[in-house]
Amino acid sequence: MTPRQEQLIALGAIFESAYLVDRIAKTGLAGEAHLACMLGSLLVRNPKDTLEVYGGDDLNLLDGYRALASALERNPQSLQREPLRYSLALVTLERQLDKRDDMLQLMGRRLDQIQLQVQHLGLTHESVVAAFASLYEDTLSTFRQRIQVHGEMRHLQNPANAARIRALLLAGIRSARLWRQLGGHRWQLVFSRRKLLDELYPLIRRN
């Protein structure tokens, strides 16, 4: 796997988190396997490669790949605006988080505790999702710049949906961190669009 392909997997995962946030906000729905894939990425330490972070394959990242492709293609008719907005906001938030060693250490400790919950309850149990959501609230929600999620009020006001959205935003931050560690930069989305698309299309077709 090439370095750019590794980056695309992580970048696609950012967009997958954003896509799921948008879907829950607008419909109240999200696939269990997709949710588990993204939440599980928060608990993977020292992976041997990027795919291992997401369960060993990228089957559950397809919607993210498509949302990313729509952003890179710049076609107003197919552009998924909210997933793009959330994804860019996640990348920006991650850069702020990187300057906060104290917060990173806190997140590491809390994720260790959540790992124990997962062993007993499973990744998508409401108590586990609530724990991820609480971690997001206690850390990233304290930054001046917050991510404003738009959708149907009846879905946004549902406590379970709100928890899933926050948990997915936390997962998006994890993927944004991985993307940057793999050499990803925002300018690539502007100046390397064609190169990214040339490698992204085969990933979409493969799935």
From Swiss-Prot:
Which residue positions does the secretion signal occupy? Answer: none
User: Per the record, what is one GO cellular component?
Assistant: cytoplasm
SUPFAM superfamilies the record matches: YcfC-like
Which subcellular locations apply to this protein? Cytoplasm; Cell inner membrane
Q: What keywords would UniProt list here? A: Cell inner membrane, Cell membrane, Cytoplasm, Membrane
Report whether Cell inner membrane shows up as a keyword of the record: yes
Record carries keyword Cell membrane: yes
Source taxon at top rank: Bacteria
Topology with regard to the membrane? Peripheral membrane protein
Q: Which family does it belong to?
A: Belongs to the HflD family.
The record, for NCBIfam families, names: PRK00218.1-2, PRK00218.1-3
HAMAP family in alphabetical order = HflD_protein
Q: Which PANTHER family match?
A: HIGH FREQUENCY LYSOGENIZATION PROTEIN HFLD
Name the chain's protein. Answer: High frequency lysogenization protein HflD homolog
Which organism was this protein described from? Azotobacter vinelandii (strain DJ / ATCC BAA-1303)
Provide the taxonomic classification: Bacteria, Pseudomonadati, Pseudomonadota, Gammaproteobacteria, Pseudomonadales
Q: Which gene encodes it?
A: hflD
